[in-house]
Amino acid sequence: NDLETICANFGGENIAACIVEPIAGSTGTLVPPKGYLQKLRQICDKHGILLIFDEVITGWGRTGSKFGAQEFGVTPDIMTMAKATTNGVVPMGVVACNDFIYDAVMDASPTGAVELFHGYTYSGIPVAVAAALAVQDIFEKDDIFNRAKNLAPYFQKGLFSLQDLDSVDNIRGYGMMGGIDMKLNTKPGKAGYECFKACYEAGVNFKATGDCLIIAPQFICEEKHIDEIIEKLRTGITNYQKNQKN
């Protein structure tokens, strides 16, 4: 409803686009409420606003589907991708758009001119494209997306089993991604950092954003690897709790 309010205050015709992550990743695996993205699509259509999905994190299987757009059944006008596009081997970013935007770019170009000038220093590197194509072949050959989808329920069950730990405030998860909020320590960010260190010493590494632990296992994991991750998370968080009492 915030977008609708902004449209009412400033005019939808003055808003070019709305960009969102299907699931906010680095801010703590924030899963949208049911129907949220569908409502966003409706508002954008109503006011002629382009809907952009940032699928840098959710793209290429992280949600259990190839893209978050497919998982939630919402089609954006523009989609951005990176990271898993090349499996991180070579940095690469990709932008996909619908036919309306594509045709607008192509038709607006003078005859004989480059349709979309994007010849920047780090753009269009052939080795990145080659890496992306090779990775896509592996995704298909090894059925990576279905592996992730099938493993996701087991991972989520293990993730939420940590809810009984005293220092854990909240847990969120979807597909092969999860966020564990730690209870506030003396100042914001301290609990997350101290818990990150304790878990690292226990043998598991992840990203901590503020007081949230971001857990995103590899798709090639097996159940035994998920068990190991959860066990070491429990050990690390428990050790963190003990250190706080000393």
Question: Which stretches of residues belong to each language-model region?
Answer:
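Conserved N-terminal phosphate-binding loop of PLP-dependent enzymes in the Aspartate aminotransferase
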Residues: 1-246
